[in-house]
């Protein structure tokens, strides 16, 4: 990197970074999670047409995915999101024979971030209540140390052990664990209802989803920002996390619905 840059370039870099981060951070993985649940439906449905239960083959594929996640994480100190998907994917195996209504209700419950609200409510009854210390900061500090040390084998071993553990624990603390489960189930529900199939009623559904999500995003984002200014770190990490997940989910729906609708245009 150059030691110094013109002021205009610094401003441009910051603008591009902030715009890209706002557009994709927390949304790219959410779209990936939706499609993960959707592709589970496709594979499960195809096997069901043959009179077979896809569940156990899916578990085997998750074992293979865990191996791939480990290989990928070996060269990436921050851990690999695929391992989170492997762990959370068990929910798809469990609900694969549930009714559409049960899957939708469960997806909504997961998306409400019940763990964060549990911790917040507990703090209301007990002012001395504290959140469980997952020690994520210390783990990532240790990851940084062996990365800077430059020992190749320590780097590989640390990444597939401590790095992966830190990544999973961060996902739990950041509210992504249950949100991922909810997104998987929403993707499965979308598949079952064939909402990606082009019909007039489905296009109306995505238009309504786009409007509702777009209207919801601004107040959710504003509330999240206000909550994050609280002097209480517990409120930031509970209520703040819940609203952060919700505003990101709303924007994710904006992106997905926009793509579905634009895909129908010849110009697109």
Protein language model features and the residues they cover:
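Solvent-exposed interhelical
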Residues: 53-55, 93-106, 189-211
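Alpha-helical transmembrane segments of multi-pass integral membrane proteins
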Residues: 235-268
């Amino acid at each position: 990197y150059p030691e110094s840059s013109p002021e205009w370039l610094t401003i441009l870099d910051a603008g591009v970074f902030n715009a890209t981060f706002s557009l994709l951070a927390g949304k790219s993985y959410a779209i990936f999670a939706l499609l993960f649940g959707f592709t589970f439906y496709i594979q499960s449905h195809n096997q069901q047409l043959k009179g077979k239960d896809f569940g156990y083959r899916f578990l085997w594929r998750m074992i293979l995915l865990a191996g791939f996640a480990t290989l990928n994480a070996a060269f990436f100190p921050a851990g690999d999101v695929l391992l989170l998907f492997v762990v959370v994917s068990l929910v798809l195996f469990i609900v694969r024979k549930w009714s559409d209504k049960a899957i939708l209700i469960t997806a909504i419950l997961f998306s409400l971030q019940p763990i964060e609200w549990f911790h917040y409510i507990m703090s209301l009854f007990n002012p001395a209540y504290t959140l469980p210390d997952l020690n994520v900061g210390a783990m990532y500090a240790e990851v940084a140390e062996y990365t800077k040390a430059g020992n190749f084998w320590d780097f590989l071993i640390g990444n597939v052990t401590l790095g992966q553990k830190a990544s999973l624990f961060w996902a739990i603390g950041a509210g992504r664990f249950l949100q991922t489960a909810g997104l998987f189930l929403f993707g499965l529900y979308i598949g079952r209802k064939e909402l990606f199939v082009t019909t007039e009623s489905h296009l109306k559904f995505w238009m309504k989803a786009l409007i509702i999500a777009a209207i919801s995003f601004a107040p959710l984002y504003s509330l999240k920002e206000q909550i994050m200014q609280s002097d209480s770190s517990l409120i930031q990490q509970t209520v703040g996390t819940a609203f952060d997940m919700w505003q990101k989910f709303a924007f994710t729906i904006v992106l997905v619905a926009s793509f579905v609708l634009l895909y129908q245009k010849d110009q697109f």
